[in-house]
Regions:
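Amphipathic alpha-helical segments
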Residues: 1-15
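Acidic, low-complexity, intrinsically disordered interaction modules
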Residues: 18-68
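Residue-level marker of intrinsically disordered, low-complexity segments enriched
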Residues: 13-14, 32, 46, 74-77, ...
Length: 86
């Protein structure tokens, strides 16, 4: 998935400095809270060939890398939690 998808869906970018993380470089990720669930992306320093993935903060077992599926999931969660559907 491309980074632009997360921006379009309203994910918030969080920058983590090298000083904060102890990594040699700054990096960032995106997050989206819907109801009591949080979707997180892979970290920018883990991206291979521009392909990002998304997962639930609450579960390491869930990993999504298909744009259409993510769009559907976000839409369904917004409906379920009665949040405006974009």
């Amino acid at each position: 998935m491309k980074e632009e998808v997360f921006i379009e869906l309203g994910f918030e970018k969080t920058i983590v400095t090298a000083e904060e993380s102890g990594s040699p470089d700054d990096w960032y990720y995106y997050s989206l809270d819907i109801g009591n669930l949080s979707l997180l992306t892979s970290a920018s320093d883990e991206i291979v060939d521009g392909n990002w993935y998304c997962y639930f903060a609450e579960s390491d077992d869930f990993k999504m890398d298909n744009e259409a599926d993510l769009r559907d999931l976000v839409r369904i969660l917004r409906i379920a939690f009665k949040i405006d559907v974009r």
